[in-house]
């Protein structure tokens, strides 16, 4: 399939020179040499056969999950127990188990960061796979983290029983002790709560309730609480937009509570009304990589960018403007052009703000209001990120003054993401409700184990007009309880979790009967009327951009806010943009890298090593932080992903990466930093060099006008091969006898590159479906990652053959410049998996006939025949073996 973009010129899109990454530039000769070799040269036999770290272990090196404490033993026992009472299968009406036949149950996930309505695939009473609930009225899609969440159920690092002063105890004793610590000076601290049943239990408990999020949207929520009287964020309807301008809002990645990838893909179908996408951002995000136009702006410039766009629109409609600092000359014209396009698009325009700033949000919301945007909906709010930084700051002050003596934390690892709270932990008695003894629960006097969402009754009201339920698909693997039952018990209640959820469904006036609600997983409820008004722009004060080096934090596709910090699938998933797995690292522009003496180099065995730096912010220093030189990164701005640097996550997550929140609290968007290169070298787990395209034409892409007006045969010619008979097609240039497919199906699959955003959800889903093993960082560095599906990312360069002819550039100089990246390169994603070739090269070279061709055109593998020669991998032109 072709990739269609709305703005690139025909010459640029048809003949872009793409390069795999910065490694191609640092050592092109070595990179080209590695491209010709499937295997790295310097992997010794000893390295291949063993691992020193596991030499004394009886556990197989390949059995990574078992070594890290993930086991299905508990699941086997739990599945042998009686079926969950009142669970309703989604598809198979009789609740009976047939060996080998899967049952599907509708459920919902909310962990304080992600919300999704899902279908849970179970076999023999065990959850094994998460599927999207396409019938859901709100966020029925899944991302990589939601897909990976099923593995967390089997994590042996979860709490197995209540803990009191570090020792296991009974629920009765733990609850009694916890209740004794609760006084009128106690506070319940949670992440955002969207469960009506849990809210009722919290109200019954009677404690002061403070909610704070690890990735804060508090200042944005403040704007709409003041405007509508309800705390939440506006919902987005991309189907109604024709032009979206996102400023720091990675809406295809982690921004917002909705998963907008499906809506984006639908809106990007080539046609006269195809959605145009413009992105302004500091670091290259998933949204920026998919944008038609990308403007590089520092995070501290976001407010200025939004202010200039607002002023242009305000002038056009005749309302007052706001005072704003001048824009940099290199982006001024681009921003003005965006404003003109927004005005022309009118109600089809959509402006999104990703900065946790009331000023930025007001500017974006008011611009949408002036344009009468149909895609920006403030009457239907999203409640999944409504924590309050103001309330949390007040709590910290009360702890300092001694006004708060005990804190109950519920499903929030606040001592990890808040350095301020961590410094005050000794001043209060802690009671923690959590799934594991994390950094917060390990410091608690009482720790109460909370069940995984796949073994608990839950409900959720994630947005206006939506009510969802979650049902257990397996009995609890350990001695844990659902959050709503724990809080209700602390409040003196005795109801079971299912009774509490049933009562909540009734009080929410769900539109479906109980059994139908469980079957579907969701129901409509009446949308609460919100106050309508207009934003007051008189108090808007636009901040001046920082002059020094800017430091900001961001989230990665696999890790998110860090809720899955002991889940190996989230670590092993390569970042869609950097193509690195397992670590977090500072992303830095090439210009800044030169200034600070930072470099990333490809090693002779194909691995990547780079410089580390010490980052200092307000006297606090993070030492030996690895740096990745990222094309498209704005000069003068560096970013570091949150969720890493754990010490009490479990065997997988402990000591992986650094904790970015030690330098920057979630409530703060950015700050000025100083950087000094250190002498420590860091080894990256890079997968991009491990899979090359052997110098062949990689991407077919065309601009929209040519796509709509031209004949496809003119720009998408079928490849031919030269022969003594003249050019031959692939079918004509056939050295083998044709396969016999007359008596059966002939399967085919194609991927629409215009729809693929590179999010990586399919990579994790493939690993789940096929039981693909996790191998760990060391093995990834040795190019032994086991993903059956990968999503290659390629950058483009501005130099093309046509440009060279126009400028009179010679051949040698032309090819040299083709290897030089643009400062803001275009990005394309290409999923690659087994192509099930008609005459698969892997089949012809296998010495034991382990790879065979089916009569339905599929490439089959007999694992018990394979002897591990890897001739198939050597002979695979797509490098997916």
PLM segments and residue spans:
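N-terminal export/assembly segments and adjacent metallocofactor-ligating motifs
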Residues: 2-329, 336, 580-584, 591-595, ...
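N-terminal leader/propeptide and maturation segments of large enzyme subunits in energy/redox metabolism
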Residues: 55, 319, 476-529, 778
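Short, well-ordered beta-strand core segments
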Residues: 244-245, 277, 294, 407, ...
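A short, gly/pro- and small-residue-rich
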Residues: 254-273, 418-432, 466-469
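Short beta-alpha connecting loops at secondary-structure transitions
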Residues: 289-295, 449-451, 466-476
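Active-site phosphate/pyrophosphate-binding segments
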Residues: 293-399, 508-510, 514
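Flexible glycine/proline-rich, aromatic-decorated loop/lid segments
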Residues: 436-470, 786
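Long, low-complexity segments enriched in small/aliphatic residues
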Residues: 507-580
């Amino acid at each position: 399939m072709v990739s269609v973009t709305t703005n690139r010129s025909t010459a640029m899109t048809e003949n872009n020179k793409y390069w795999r990454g910065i490694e191609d530039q640092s050592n092109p000769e070595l990179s080209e040499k590695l491209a010709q070799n499937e295997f790295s040269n310097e992997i010794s036999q000893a390295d291949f056969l063993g691992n020193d770290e596991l030499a004394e272990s009886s556990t197989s090196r390949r059995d990574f999950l078992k070594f890290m404490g993930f086991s299905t033993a508990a699941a086997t026992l739990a599945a042998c127990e009686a079926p969950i009472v009142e669970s309703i299968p989604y598809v198979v009406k009789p609740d009976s188990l047939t060996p080998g036949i899967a049952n599907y149950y509708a459920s919902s996930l909310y962990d304080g960061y992600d919300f999704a309505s899902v279908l849970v695939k179970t076999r023999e009473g065990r959850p094994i796979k998460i599927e999207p609930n396409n019938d859901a009225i709100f966020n029925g899609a899944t991302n990589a983290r939601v897909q990976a969440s099923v593995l967390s159920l089997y994590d042996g690092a979860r709490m197995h029983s209540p803990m009191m002063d570090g020792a296991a105890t009974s629920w009765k004793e733990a609850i009694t002790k916890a209740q004794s610590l609760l006084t009128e000076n106690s506070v319940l601290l949670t992440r955002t709560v969207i469960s009506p049943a849990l809210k009722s239990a919290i109200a019954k408990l009677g404690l002061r309730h403070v909610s704070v999020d690890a990735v804060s949207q508090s200042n944005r929520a403040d704007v709409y609480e003041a405007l509508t009287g309800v705390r939440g964020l506006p919902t987005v309807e991309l189907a109604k937009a024709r032009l979206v301008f996102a400023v720091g809002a990675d809406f295809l990645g982690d921004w917002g509570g909705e998963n907008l990838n499906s809506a984006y893909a639908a809106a990007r179908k080539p046609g006269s009304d195809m959605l145009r996408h413009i992105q302004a951002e500091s670091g290259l995000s998933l949204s920026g990589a998919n944008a038609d136009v990308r403007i590089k702006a520092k995070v501290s410039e976001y407010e200025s960018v939004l202010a200039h766009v607002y002023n242009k629109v305000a002038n056009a409609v005749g309302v007052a403007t706001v005072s704003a600092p001048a824009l940099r000359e290199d982006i001024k014209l681009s921003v003005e052009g965006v404003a003109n396009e927004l005005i022309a698009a009118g109600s089809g325009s959509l402006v999104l703000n990703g900065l946790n700033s009331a000023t930025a949000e007001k500017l974006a919301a008011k611009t949408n209001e002036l344009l009468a945007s149909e895609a920006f909906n403030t009457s239907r709010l999203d409640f999944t990120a409504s924590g309050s930084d103001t309330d949390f700051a007040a709590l910290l002050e009360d702890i300092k003054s001694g006004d708060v003596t005990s804190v109950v934390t519920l499903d929030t690892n606040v001592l990890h993401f808040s350095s301020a709270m961590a410094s005050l932990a000794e001043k209060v008695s802690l009671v923690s409700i959590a799934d594991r003894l994390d950094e917060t629960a390990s410091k608690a006097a009482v720790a109460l184990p909370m069940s995984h969402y796949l073994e608990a009754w839950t409900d959720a009201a994630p947005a206006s007009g939506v009510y969802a339920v979650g049902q257990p698909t397996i009995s609890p693997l350990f001695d844990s309880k659902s959050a709503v039952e724990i809080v209700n018990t602390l409040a003196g209640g005795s109801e079971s979790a299912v009774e509490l959820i049933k009562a909540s469904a009734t009080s929410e006036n769900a539109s479906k009967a109980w059994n139908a609600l469980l079957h579907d997983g969701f129901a409509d409820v009446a949308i609460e009327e919100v106050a309508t008004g207009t934003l007051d722009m008189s108090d808007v004060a636009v901040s001046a951009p920082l002059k020094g080096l800017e430091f900001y934090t961001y989230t990665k596709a696999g890790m998110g806010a860090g809720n899955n910090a002991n889940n190996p699938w989230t670590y092993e998933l390569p970042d869609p943009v950097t193509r690195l797995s397992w670590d977090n690292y500072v992303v830095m522009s090439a210009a800044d890298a030169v200034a600070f003496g930072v470099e990333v180099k490809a090693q002779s065995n194909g691995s990547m090593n780079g410089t580390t730096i010490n980052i200092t912010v307000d006297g606090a220093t993070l030492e030996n932080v690895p740096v990745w030189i990222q094309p498209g990164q704005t000069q003068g701005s560096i970013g570091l992903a949150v969720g890493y640097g754990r010490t009490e996550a479990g065997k997988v997550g402990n000591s992986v990466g650094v904790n970015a929140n030690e330098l920057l609290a979630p409530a703060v968007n950015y700050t000025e930093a100083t950087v000094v290169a250190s002498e420590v070298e860091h080894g990256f787990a890079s997968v991009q060099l491990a899979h090359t395209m052997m110098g062949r034409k990689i991407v077919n892409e065309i601009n929209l006008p040519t796509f709509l007006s031209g004949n496809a045969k003119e720009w998408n010619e079928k490849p031919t091969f030269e022969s003594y008979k003249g050019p031959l097609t692939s079918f004509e240039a056939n050295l083998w006898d044709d396969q016999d497919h007359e008596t059966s199906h002939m399967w085919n699959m194609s991927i629409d590159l215009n729809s693929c955003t590179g999010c990586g959800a399919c990579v994790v889903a493939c690993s789940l479906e096929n039981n693909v093993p996790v191998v760990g960082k060391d093995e990834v560095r040795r190019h032994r990652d086991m993903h059956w599906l990968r999503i290659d990312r390629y950058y483009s360069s501005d130099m093309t053959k046509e440009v060279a002819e126009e400028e009179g550039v010679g051949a040698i100089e032309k090819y040299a410049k083709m290897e030089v990246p643009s400062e803001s390169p275009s990005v394309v994603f290409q999923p690659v998996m087994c192509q099930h070739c008609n005459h698969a090269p892997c089949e012809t070279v296998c010495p034991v006939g382990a790879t065979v061709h089916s009569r339905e055109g599929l490439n089959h593998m007999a694992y018990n025949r394979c002897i591990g020669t890897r001739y198939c991998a050597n002979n695979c032109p797509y490098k997916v073996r």
